[in-house]
Every structure is written in C-alpha cells, then in structure tokens.
Amino acid sequence: MLRIDIVTIFPEMFKGPFDVSILKKAQDKGLVEIKVYNLRDFTEDKHRTVDDYPYGGGSGMVMKPEPIFKAVRSLKKEDSEVILLSPSGDLFNQKIAEELSKKNHLILICGRYEGVDERVKSIITREISIGDYVLTGGEIPAMVIVDAVVRLVPGVLGDPDSLREESFQWGILEYPQYTHPRDFEGMKVPDILLSGNHERIRRWRRKEALKKTFLKRPDLLEKTSLTQEDLELLEEIKKELREEV
C-alpha cells in the first residue's frame, strides 16, 4: 500500500478532491492511504507561527524551518520520499509520476509565502515543480501529483488497458476518441473506426497519435523511443502536411 502524507497550512483545501472518483476508490480499496496534516500542529508557540520575516530584508514572509523539521521527523520512515513542492524543483512529468508510484511512502510539503527557509532542503529528498508559472502555494501542485501517482498504483484503475493507452504513457499524445452518435451536426466518426478491422484501426490510431504529437508537442518525439513503423508513419504525416499547404 502506498501511503501519502501531506503537510500544509491549509488542510481544508484537500477535503473535496480526495473524496471523489478514483482517489476515493483507491483509498476504499486499501491500495492508498492519504493523510493531511496541519503544519501549525507542529509549532510550539502559542500563536502557532509558521512564518517569519526574511533575514536581509525583502518583501513577504518565509516559512520557518522548525515546524517543517518537526513534521518530517514525526512522519518519516526509512524508505520515505520527502518532497518539497517548489518552483525551483524538477518539472513534474509522467516519468516522475511512475517513479513515485513505486514508492511505499511519500511526504509532500506544501510551500507558501515567499518560500521556505533554505535549511529545509537538508531534510528533503527532492523538489518538484508542476510548471513555469506562479501559484499561491504548494497545495494545488500536491493535488496534481497525488492524482497522477495514485492512478498508476496497481489495482487502482479497473481497466489496465486504459492506463496503457493514455497520453504520455507511451511518450506521445493520445489518438482522437469518438463515441455515439455516428453523425453529430455533420461531423462524422471516421469510417475506419467502424470497419471492424482491428489492425487498420490500430495503425490509424497510432498515426493520429503521432500526428497530434508532431503538431502540438514535437518535443515529446525527441524524448521517446520510436519504432520503425512510427518513423514510417511520421514520414507519411509530414508528406501529407506538405501536400496540404
């Protein structure tokens, strides 16, 4: 079972997201245990202070080291992965999600204000960012990471095929999806999906996935392993796009 402990000054933010859908089912099945801790419970002064002014001056407040150290020390085990959600961390992606899903215990520390005291870095194992933009705190990044990681835990998703076919699972974007009706306001489902020819459908889906990736996220093609068929399909795609111009 994967255990995830989240340390935050706003525990109420996590009440909704973890009580519905796949995250709730994963907990109900006993595959994942998620607990949220209020950082203020690890303070020792009557005001439950978690932040203070920065040395050297500057705007904003900085999260104090003492409560974070105390929280981590009370929760940490030998095999714990202690993660600080930080703009300066490694950019979160599917590969990191897969790595974390294989861990036994994750501790997520949600930063706030102008950041955390630099000395906190001495007790964490990695820093993670979810993107190059500014957020109010680490709570939303923590939710993103938990959602991405939990769905990869064996047994969480009912259909293993859905996990294998998802975007990024094979390093590229997913092929287009269609459902009923067959014709909606003149927009029709591609005939090949109605052909019943599984090999042609498979090839069409792979080609469409490669095309979408080539047009929207070409950087992904440089990072993934492509088969000979993929390379041939990409040449077809490039030729077709040139002919459209």
Curated annotation (Swiss-Prot):
Question: What are the UniProt keywords, alphabetically?
Answer: Cytoplasm, Methyltransferase, S-adenosyl-L-methionine, Transferase, tRNA processing
Where is the protein localized? Cytoplasm
Catalysed transformations (reactions): guanosine(37) in tRNA + S-adenosyl-L-methionine = N(1)-methylguanosine(37) in tRNA + S-adenosyl-L-homocysteine + H(+)
Q: Which residues cross the membrane?
A: none
**Residues that coordinate or bind S-adenosyl-L-methionine:** G111, I130, G131, D132, Y133, V134, L135
Q: Record's GO cellular component, any one?
A: cytosol
Domain of life of the organism in this record? Bacteria
Output one GO BP term: tRNA N1-guanine methylation
Predominant subcellular localization, coarse grouping: cytoplasm
Q: Does the keyword Transcription regulation apply?
A: no
Any one Pfam family match given in the protein's UniProt record, by short name:
tRNA_m1G_MT
Give the record's subunit note: Homodimer.
Question: What is this protein for, i.e. what is its function?
Answer: Specifically methylates guanosine-37 in various tRNAs.
The identity of this protein, by name, is tRNA (guanine-N(1)-)-methyltransferase
